[in-house]
Structures are given as structure tokens and as C-alpha cells.
Amino acid sequence: NAGKQGQQIVYKSEKPLGAHITGAEPAKNWTKADGNVYVTRIPNSVFGTYNPYTTLVSGDWFIAYMTAHTGDIFLNGKSMYEVKTLDEVKAPKVYEASWDPDFTLYTWYTEQDDEKDETVIYANFQGKDPNKEDVEYTARRNCFYPSEEHVGFITLSGFKVSKAATQWAPPTAYQEGMIGPHWSKGWIIEDCEIFESKCSGISLGKYRQQNNDNKWLKWKYKDGTQTERDC
């Protein structure tokens, strides 16, 4: 429900940063596949209508050396590195351009088992036992985000908020975030620690416009000036 001007609805952690809103779930039941590589399976029913492990990050002006999924795998609170093939999980290589090159050896890969309707995750934990570590997978698209527009005058105060499978949010698209008002007004987001969103942590961006949603990517749209140049 929305608040009113001068009458905010307040969500506040009793202890500053003591409460944690997360879009992740524990990843359990790992079995050893090969060397340092383990595998686990997640029923697709867990994800409802949005499976982060079949959804690729995409949108206008998104350019990357590799197109990743919106889902992620976390080891002790830190996101591991998705790779394109199972072979890259079995024999990972250091990515020197990373802020933490050594951690780039902690890789994961996903595929679908259509017969069993399951998401299959392979991960290289570099000798660690994932059944004894804190391993999580992204299960939700957002953490604190109304499903409807115009839910105004909300305060979010003092929470840790992390690990959402957010989509790319260019100005030509529906701009979602891990936290966001979804085209509402009067929101206050304060004293929060926000981390490990796949894309946007906080989005104050626009609503969905069906005929103007990632139009450059979907329809190779060109504005008037570009059309003139082509002519």
C-alpha cells in the first residue's frame, strides 16, 4: 500500500544494517563432478515466470565481451564468474583485467535439463567444499520494488539489500532495479548498504512502454537524423 504526503509508510531495520533483504537462496545438494567442479540442480518451479538462468542481460547500448545471464552464483557473499562453456569451468583462466584476478578462477556455467525441467549449475570452487561454504543462487528479480506503479511515499531505512537478478536498464527501456519506486513519488531510501545486483542497485527510472522498450535492440530503430544520413 502507498503512504501519503506527510504520512510515509516506513520500513526500518531495528538495528542499523542488522536486517538483510536478499534476492538469493541457499544453493545446496552439491555433488562432485570432476576435480574442483561440483554440480547442483534447481527445480525451475522455484523461479516462477522469471528464470534468471534462461534470461540473458540485454538491452539498448549493452555491449560486453560475453553475454551473461541475469542470475548469479555467490560464494561467501561474493559473485563468482560466469563462463560460456563447461570446459571453462573445468580449466578456468585468470582474467587479469578484473579488480580481483585470483577470484576469476571461481567460475560457473549453467544449462537447462528440459526433460526434468531443472536448471543445472556447474561451479569450480578451487578446492573448497560448497556443502560446507555459504553458496547462494539468485532467485528473485528485485528485492524491494512494488509490482504496480504509483505506490508512493515509502521509506526504506537501514537495511542491507543484495543479490537480485536485475535486467539492464537503459533510458529507452523499463528501468528496474534491485530497489526502486517503479514510477512512484515521495520515496526515501536512506542508510542502506546495497550490493551485488546484477545490473542496477537503485533505479528511479521509467515505467514500461510497450512500443518504446529497447527499440534500438528489438527493431533496429533509427531516429530522424540517422535516417537522413542513410538517405
Language model features with spans:
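Extracellular polysaccharide-degrading/modifying enzymes targeting complex plant/algal/animal polysaccharides
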Residues: 1-183, 188, 193-195, 201-203, ...
